[in-house]
Amino acid sequence: MNKTYLPSQGAIERNWYVVDAADQRLGRLATEIARVLRGKHKPTYTPHMDTGDFVIVINADKVTVTGRKASQKLYRRHSGRPGGMKVETFAHLQQRLPERIIEQAVKGMLPKNALGRQLFTKLKVYRGAEHPHQAQQPEVLSIQTFAGDDN
């Protein structure tokens, strides 16, 4: 019987990647980001360990959705008080807090446990093209969200 490979915490290399979300489709972009955060793109992937990389997303305000989702997709949050449900459309939330759209999409694709919360801290989302992580020298991660597109 083969023994499962288990990397030590010190042996795990964590890279920094920057992703440009301009004109990218939300769901397909979030899927790829979650895969990199989880570490599934590495041969050292282990399901119960954090083997993933850091991801910086820029131009979050320019992410797109297909069809009529801009006006029909709803984001809900609750204050915890009676009658405290707030409902917002994609278009309105994109104007107000575009970072939250990508954060919620990626968070829903991560495990719902302590490991998922730890992985989520490695996601950094910014509205514009600038980010404060130049010191980490992030590599550009190109994600193609439509077959045949050069996005």
Swiss-Prot record:
Claim: Ribonucleoprotein is one of the keywords in the record: yes
Keywords recorded for this protein, A-Z: Ribonucleoprotein, Ribosomal protein
Keyword Magnesium among UniProt keywords: no
PROSITE patterns, alphabetized: RIBOSOMAL_L13
Gene Ontology molecular-function annotations: mRNA binding; structural constituent of ribosome
InterPro entries: Ribosomal_uL13, Ribosomal_uL13_bac-type, Ribosomal_uL13_CS, Ribosomal_uL13_sf
Coiled coil feature spans: none
GO cellular component: cytosolic large ribosomal subunit
Domain of life: Bacteria
GO BP term, example: translation
Complex formation: Part of the 50S ribosomal subunit.
Family membership noted in the UniProt record: Belongs to the universal ribosomal protein uL13 family.
Protein task: This protein is one of the early assembly proteins of the 50S ribosomal subunit, although it is not seen to bind rRNA by itself. It is important during the early stages of 50S assembly.
NCBIfam families according to UniProt: rplM_bact
Entry protein name: Large ribosomal subunit protein uL13
Source organism per UniProt: Synechococcus elongatus (strain ATCC 33912 / PCC 7942 / FACHB-805) (Anacystis nidulans R2)
